[in-house]
Amino acid sequence: MGSIAITTGNFENEVLQSPVPVLLDFWAPWCGPCKMIGPVIDQIAGEYSDQLKVGKINIDEEPALAEKHGIVSIPTLLVYKDGSLAAQKAGAAPKHDIINLFKNLL
């Protein structure tokens, strides 16, 4: 399973009620660093598909979600587990750093 688009409409069901941890990528199509880590996020979605849900939130299309989560720079990665925020990282990061955000929650 690849990444899914997270919206205000599906946030509660896909993130807060998820039985597995959820890695959220707040991004925008005009963001250079977002374009750099986008393929890495997609790789992680494929490699951890049985243990982790990966969602992408386009801040241009979902400004209310970005504001609710206090997103001030992108990319920003958040990890939710059992309906609560468990980890976060702002800025582009190498794959191993992204994996370390959620590895101990699996």
Task: Show which residues each predicted segment covers.
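Conserved Rossmann-like nucleotide-binding pocket used by diverse enzymes
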Residues: G2, T7, W27, K53-G55
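A short beta-strand-turn-helix
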Residues: S3-V22
